[in-house]
Amino acid sequence: MQNGYSVSIQHYTAKTTAMKTLKIWRPIFQRWLGKKGPVDPRYVFSRPPNNKGQDGTHFFTNPQDDNGGDNSGAEGIGEAIAKQRRQKRTRFAYNLFWVSIAGVLGYSIGYKVIYKKEQSFLPLMPASRVHKLNDRDARRIGIDKIRVLSRLKVLEQLSQHEMIKEQYGVPLLNVNTHETPNVDELTVWCEDSDPCVTGLVLEPDDGRPTIHNWYRLPYVFKWRLTHRPINIHKTINDISQNLGLTLSDVFQIITPEKVYGSFKYEYPLTSDDHYTKIWFLGEMKLGDDSLIIYKGKFHRDVTLEQIHLLRRENGKLIRYILYKNE
């Protein structure tokens, strides 16, 4: 019995030792069988170390995203430098813009208005030469006066035209009412002779009465939006005066067109910033199918520029030029 029991124990011990040995050698055999190429004898019973270090060019990026080859690092550095330069230029332009605005406002408001107590003008954008008349200017000019004078001038010119005398007769009468035609529509506007800019007029807030509507910073300054012409000759003259020169002592520019009755000496609006030219456009009906349209300018008296007749004939609208000031 004892011999049989000893044999069983020895058999169990040998089996256990063989299983432990198999567990130790199994990963080695698997690595030998699965690895291609010769096996390094230094790492038969261990794993070879991983010598791959961190790539400095991909410290914050994934190396798999880099498909540019050896030049990818240099290209990335170049793009970063170019981006930084663009940001510096943008920042410089932005700072220069605000410094310029601060300088202009400081000179216009702080120096001219507050310190020297003078008027200052800040141009903002180009303005149209054509402007509508406000109520104050319309009352001062007298729209009714333009209506009466233009009607008399138009009737005088039409009564002398051969076509009007033959087809409508003299005195000229409305075909439907058999009365002298009246002005049905009249539009009046002003036009500047020089290019204009829209800007801000700044003045000290001294409490004086004024005809304009102002925005105020009490006891400091006031401002309003207006437009002013760009007179090159006046600008050069102002610059020369600041330098101690006077152009009128050397020469004087005389434009033959700018005489009485032309742009420069047209109807001047009192206390306004510049001279303007007053234009008007009127309509008079001669019948259901006939319409007189005339255009002219006003300076104490009416000067006609054009008179047209619009008439419907055979379903078509025909225009006749009856008068044109050459």
UniProtKB/Swiss-Prot annotation:
Keywords: Membrane, Mitochondrion, Transit peptide, Transmembrane, Transmembrane helix. GO terms for cellular component: mitochondrial membrane. Residues 1-40 form a transit peptide. It is found in: Mitochondrion membrane. It is a single-pass membrane protein. Residues 48-65 have a biased composition (Polar residues). Residues 47-75 are annotated as: Disordered. The chain crosses the membrane at residues 93-115. Belongs to the AIM39 family. This is Altered inheritance of mitochondria protein 39, mitochondrial. It comes from Zygosaccharomyces rouxii (strain ATCC 2623 / CBS 732 / NBRC 1130 / NCYC 568 / NRRL Y-229).
